[in-house]
Amino acid sequence: MLVRGRDQGSGSRLGPIVRRWAPRPSPLQSLAASLDAEPSSAAVPDGFPAGPTVSPRRLARPPGLEEALSALGLQGEREYAGDIFAEVMVCRVLPLRALPRAVTPEMRALVVDWLVQVHEYLGLAGDTLYLAVHLLDSYLSAGRVRLHRLQLLGVACLFVACKMEECVLPEPAFLCLLSADSFSRAELLRAERRILSRLDFRLHHPGPLLCLGLLAALAGSSPQVMLLATYFLELSLLEAEAAGWEPGRRAAAALSLAHRLLDGAGSRLQPELYRCSLGGGSVWGHRSFRDLPSWSFLRSRRMRDNY
């Protein structure tokens, strides 16, 4: 549960996280099971195990890729369209069980939900939020973290993501103010250094939001479908198992679900587009949509209000 402080002048402050975690069913469990991800125990130099990946060599360039990049404002990268597509669609992901034992999925969801509020309050770019959550999951998978420092860790990850994605950075003191002074500016900067050290400065991550834009442009999706798919993609941030999905599969699942809801049960993306973007395999498998109604009961009312 999240609380807000009383209004101070013309603005309001976001209050600290209240430690109340209630178990809830995972609304994306059926989708996660259908992604056919295989666990991997291979180690990588930055200290945490690599998740399942699909080799970029298996990706075929879909027709209309150059036009899709142009629609996203990437005209200068047309020469490298195939390499860009392979890089953003398939990259290393985190293992499905990446959380420390002391951190439950409900605790993580609470921190991410609070970060969504801070992200909206500051008016940050969408890629900043996805990168912040990725850094949070990477840090949690790399080692232990104290429970009373989860909020500090989340804010520090958002601060690092702002340095990667934003032109104007929020002041560290203002981030502390939004947290109701739960930690000091010096503690925030120390947390930033710990993140950089533990992750070995591996901060770049092509998030699923770019993949969604590419797939929507390739499929010719309507703005309504794109908006609904973006909502589903943002809801997946609350799910810890979503960190184990390749960005391309994650975006394709959200886009296909949006098409099915708005265009009818028989509507879905072209199978050849899936094969090009995911290197084979199936997004849906043989799972039904029996968990679909639970999406509307997620406790993140902030996300529903945003869309």
Swiss-Prot record:
Domain of life of the source: Eukaryota
GO MF terms held by the record: cyclin-dependent protein serine/threonine kinase regulator activity
Region of interest (Disordered), residue spans: 1-21, 35-60
Subcellular location: Nucleus
Tissue localization of expression: Expression is induced in lung and colon cancer cells.
Cellular compartments per GO CC: cyclin-dependent protein kinase holoenzyme complex; cytoplasm; nucleus
Keywords for this protein: Nucleus
Domain Cyclin N-terminal: 102-203
GO biological process terms on file: G1/S transition of mitotic cell cycle
Its job: Seems to be involved in the regulation of proliferation and migration.
Name under which the protein is recorded: Cyclin-P
Organism, as annotated: Homo sapiens
Name of the gene: CCNP
